[in-house]
Amino acid sequence: MSCFSGVLNQSDAFASLNRAWTTGSRPVGAVGLSETGKALVLHALYEQQKKPLLVLTPDEASAVKLTEDLRTLQGDVLLYPAREMNFVQVAGASHEYELLRLDVLSRMAAGAYTAVVAPVAAACQLTMPPAELLERTRTVKVGDDVPPGQLVQALVAAGYVRHDQVDGTSQFALRGGILDIFPPGRTEPVRLEFWGDTIESMTAFDLATQRRTEALNSLRITPSAEVLFADAEKTAKAIEALAAGLRGKATKAREKLLTDADNLRKTGTLPCKDKYLPLVYQSNGLFDYCNGLLAVCDSAKVKEDNVIGTLEQGECVHVERPVTLQI
């Protein structure tokens, strides 16, 4: 136990807060805390309960600040950012925040975190459900027998893009018996060398020099896109149903929907996947991954300034899980 938790444990107010959580008397609240005080209370609760935290903040700036404060007190604190939804085809659209989010979701699904801090707008955005993420996640080890072609199919299904040579995240390249993969969350790509169908060696390597930097025994390959069409035919039919429901003068919209349905059948994917996200997943967003304490900082501001605005944009999800702590 840290010295900060030790001091807080001597406080009657904190003891009452901790007792309320333990006995299930929720929601509970703590008022009058400074920004640093919020981090200290959350850290002390984590140490007492030994359960991970999901903390919602009003905006990105407050999320970044709280993440930094918590990281000085405990390890494996993750920041879950909001991302810009792409509803039209945009050349060269950045996927930086999407990849950051996928890394956080993968670590939450694996239980490899102590706290996740998220602006409420980010937490309310639809995303891949845990079951789908785990189904698309694969771990390979040195000595495994797996045909390279089979692994390539799994990578494509998980949203990776094939290149002649890997030069960025979410890419892979296959040359003979060598398979290079750059999963989200890693700082360097990984090279798998095969002897037939057996993984003979596995090493991280530098993108610029192509030199090996670290020998690995295993690699966890996680999805590289939040929207994956597991059943392209089913989604195509749902898009066609939307088109059939359009009436009046919505000719162009109907044509666009039918074109997307046709392209999805032919290629298995679409360049503007986000607009069909509600057809692909039944999701409560980040809340589906929460199995510990849910805390809200500045709860009144979160509700007024963010949730209403997100609802107006049609991006918010309905969550029945009760807030357990308001600070």
Per-range role (PLM):
Residues 1-327:
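ASCE RecA-like P-loop NTPase motor cores
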